[in-house]
């Protein structure tokens, strides 16, 4: 099914439902890209970085394929690939292990937008599947988001797009335009308020000695680690369920030394490509030029044959 303007609310509700299913007790930060929509007017910062990187700290690859050139008012497809090892498991919000989910944001040039359902070929609809692509906001139809969705099923996404027509949209010209994509797999390491999730490494805030490691009971688990400083002050660091403690009682540590491993197996990546909005008149002119060249070549060959016949006749005479 493909998103329609009148289905905007339905798409949001569905996306939030999927988010809840994959992150049952997680704060909104893990519900990418919804939290970006709520906190940023534009997902691409002035320096070119896509805001998803603020919470997904690990760098991973992402691929984007589009045609080299498209004609105006034409439906074409963009293929996004978010590769990862589907055998690995991530730490969920409840501290348990589960499959990774993926999400992406596609930033199109002004005038480009999601293709209407009635203009998408049946073959392309099959490639899209049941993904709902929704605008980043009501006034930014050229920015599309989706996710989180199951990574095993949607590590490759096909987005049906509609190119603008400069004849009807005076803000668009026949030029080369950039397209940006950001794609992530797995949960983030930081929440919007700056606090850590349970999908990251925890470091010691001070230097001292580990005096106690207490395992917490409950559904989410976790630990409390007591660190005694040189002046005798005891500081307690709480570790949520998910990361594994890698220090021992009696161990001397320094500030910023890791107390846990880094459980994160996901990451975020971004890429940009270019697409040319091609003027049909230019193509027609180019074809006409090639036709003239071909005709000239044919005439030259014919003329050469005639000349050779005349020479041969004169020699025989």
Swiss-Prot record:
Subcellular location, record wording: Plastid, Chloroplast thylakoid membrane
Transmembrane segments annotated in the record for this chain: 280-302
Signal peptide region: 1-31
Residues given in the record as heme binding sites: 32, 52, 55-56
Cofactor binding note from Swiss-Prot or TrEMBL: Binds 1 heme group covalently.
Pfam families in the record: Apocytochr_F_C, Apocytochr_F_N
Keywords: Chloroplast, Electron transport, Heme, Iron, Membrane, Metal-binding, Photosynthesis, Plastid, Signal, Thylakoid, Transmembrane, Transmembrane helix, Transport
GO biological process, one term: photosynthesis
Domain of life of the organism encoding this protein: Eukaryota
GO molecular function, one term: heme binding
Bilayer topology: Single-pass membrane protein
InterPro entries: Cyt-f_TM, Cyt_f, Cyt_f_lg_dom, Cyt_f_lg_dom_sf, Rudment_hybrid_motif
GO CC annotation terms, alphabetical: chloroplast thylakoid membrane
Cofactor: heme
HAMAP family named in the record: Cytb6_f_cytF
Quaternary structure, from the entry: The 4 large subunits of the cytochrome b6-f complex are cytochrome b6, subunit IV (17 kDa polypeptide, petD), cytochrome f and the Rieske protein, while the 4 small subunits are PetG, PetL, PetM and PetN. The complex functions as a dimer.
Protein purpose: Component of the cytochrome b6-f complex, which mediates electron transfer between photosystem II (PSII) and photosystem I (PSI), cyclic electron flow around PSI, and state transitions.
Stated family: Belongs to the cytochrome f family.
Name the record gives this protein: Cytochrome f
């Amino acid at each position: 099914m493909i998103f329609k303007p009148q289905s905007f609310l339905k798409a949001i509700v569905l996306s939030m439902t999927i988010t809840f299913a994959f992150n049952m007790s997680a704060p909104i930060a893990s519900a990418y890209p919804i939290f970006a929509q709520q906190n940023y007017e534009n997902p691409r910062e002035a320096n070119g970085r896509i805001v998803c990187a603020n919470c997904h700290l690990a760098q991973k690859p992402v691929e984007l394929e589009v045609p080299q050139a498209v004609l105006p008012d034409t439906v074409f497809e963009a293929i996004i690939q978010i590769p990862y090892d589907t055998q690995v498991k991530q730490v969920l919000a409840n501290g348990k292990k589960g499959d990774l989910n993926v999400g992406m944001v596609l930033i199109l040039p002004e005038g480009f937008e999601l293709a209407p359902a009635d203009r998408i070929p049946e073959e392309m609809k099959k490639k899209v599947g049941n993904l709902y692509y929704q605008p980043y906001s009501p006034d930014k139809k050229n920015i599309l988001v989706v996710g989180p969705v199951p990574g095993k099923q949607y590590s490759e996404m096909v987005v049906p797009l509609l190119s603008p027509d400069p004849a009807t949209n005076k803000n668009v010209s026949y030029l080369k335009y950039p397209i940006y994509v950001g794609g992530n797999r797995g949960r983030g390491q930081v929440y919007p308020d700056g606090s850590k999730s349970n999908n990251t490494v925890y470091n010691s805030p001070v230097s001292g000695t580990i005096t106690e490691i207490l395992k917490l009971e409950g559904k989410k688990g976790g630990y409390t680690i007591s660190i005694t400083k040189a002046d005798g002050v005891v500081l307690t660091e709480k570790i949520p369920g998910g990361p594994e403690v890698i220090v021992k009682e009696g161990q001397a540590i320094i500030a910023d030394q890791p107390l846990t491993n880094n459980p994160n197996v996901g990451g975020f990546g971004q890429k940009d490509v270019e697409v040319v909005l091609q003027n049909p008149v230019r193509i027609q002119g180019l074809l006409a030029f090639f036709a003239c060249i071909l005709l000239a070549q044919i005439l030259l060959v014919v003329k050469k044959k005639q000349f050779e016949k005349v020479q041969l006749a004169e020699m025989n005479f």
